């Protein structure tokens, strides 16, 4: 395989590095100062300013391969750009290339309905809302996702969701509006990798309770955060199921 950078990638690297020098690095102290002196769990003014500048510079949504909504880059072409963005912890969000939104947006692009894309993907791509991903659970070793115990049960035209998740990345952000939830819809399936499904859950749905945000080595990652969330008899439309029951691992 040829790992040499294409002319397109080299040009983007140069533009991205210049943007980092001009706008990101000089604003790092301001970013952390705004977090420290204001409400830690509210978006900072400087980040919103940087996002608009990145859009104007054509350095927005650089991820999302094989989609007209992205920048037309393969993962191989996107990787060296991530290396540059990764030089400042605040940078990926400024380019709308931060986790878990990038992965969640790709899931919506690949497997969401047109209504999902209109309601959730479009504002995510525009940087107006954020998202979170809920898989890990406190009661089981979730590094092996076949262990998860949360339930997704069909009830007519709805699914009912119950369980407790933690380390739900992005849930602390007040702009977070949608959760991609992974749970078991068919726990008795002989194929352990067909027991799980992924489903969309609005964060303001009745029964979704954010219990606390969790620090990582003492760092709370405000205003993004990693939360412990309780799902108690949460009802969502059956149309919120992604790809189909039992296809959670296929999506992952």
Regions found by a protein language model. Name each.
Residues 1-99, 110, 115-126, 130:
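Amphipathic, small/basic residue-rich leader segments at the start of a protein or domain
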Residues 58, 81-87, 182-185, 200-206, ...:
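Short Ser/Thr-interspersed hydrophobic loop/turn segments at strand-loop and sheet-helix junctions
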Residues 72-84, 144-147, 230, 236:
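Structural signature of FAD isoalloxazine-binding scaffolds in flavoprotein oxidoreductases
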Residues 105-111, 133-134, 188:
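Flexible, glycine-rich active-site loops centered on histidine and acidic residues
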Residues 127-136, 181-182:
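A short, Trp-centered hydrophobic/proline-enriched beta-strand micro-motif
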Residues 150-153:
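A structural signal for short hydrophobic beta-strand segments in well-ordered beta-sheet cores
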Residues 158, 162-211:
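A short core secondary-structure module
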Residues 203-252:
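A glycine-rich, basic-preceded beta-loop-alpha segment at the flavin cofactor/substrate interface
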